[in-house]
Amino acid sequence: MIIASLFEERAQGLYHNTTAVIDADGAYLGKYRKNHIPDDPGFYEKFYFTPGDTGYRMFETQYARIGTLICWDQWYPEAARITALMGADILFFPTAIGWDTAETSEAANREQYEAWQTIQRSHAIANGVHVVSVNRTGIEAGTRFWGGSFVANPFGTVLYQAPHNTPVTQVVEIDLRLNRKYREVWPFLRDRRIDTYHPVTNRWIDKT
């Protein structure tokens, strides 16, 4: 199975940050277009990319039901929750994120990386799924990409973490039976009060 990240030229001047999913037998299963487009120092993607319009996607592969979310999507619990509710057993996050080499310290770098890993491990716990986050390494245009790709189980336990500075290829075995186990122990999906969540669709909740 391949999750291929690409810059999709949909039309002249219309570009998406996209992943294509190809199954183990070579069958093309579909694509997901990145929904959340950042515009912050070092990551001015709104200049290049249009927000996705595929909605969130779940793909039935020969090995598991998977969801793909791209980079900045990983900071939004709503994206992970919706993809999990669609039936995904594993959430994949292809990523290119790092530090400004001129402005950060080792302490700040460590704090940012830990925040990045923590938010994704929380998606694993809250949704009872495995998370696979794959980040690039190296330096480009003043950004040192922090690597540190990792795999977490539904309890948020890190099963593997890659080095920060060296690209690696790693096979990690996961047990999808743990999804059911942890969802039965911590039945967060069962206990959701979906009738109370409408306010989350507001940009901000103003005082009345």
Residues covered by each model-derived region:
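CN hydrolase (nitrilase-like) catalytic-core segments centered on the catalytic cysteine
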Residues: 1-3, 65, 71-169
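Short beta-strand scaffold segments in enzyme catalytic cores
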Residues: 4-6, 18-21, 57, 149-151, ...
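Short glycine/acidic-enriched loop and turn motifs that connect beta-strands
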Residues: 9-11, 139-140
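Residue-level detector of high-confidence beta-strand sites
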Residues: 18, 31-33, 161-163, 171
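Short, glycine-anchored, charge-dense loop/turn motifs used at functional sites
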Residues: 21-29, 152-159
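Active-site beta-strand termini and strand-to-loop segments that position acidic
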Residues: 23-24, 59-62, 153-154, 174
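A short, polar/charged loop-to-alpha-helix boundary motif
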Residues: 34-48, 166-184
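Cysteine/selenocysteine-centered motifs that mediate thiol-based redox chemistry or coordinate metal-sulfur cofactors
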Residues: 54-89, 93-95, 179-208
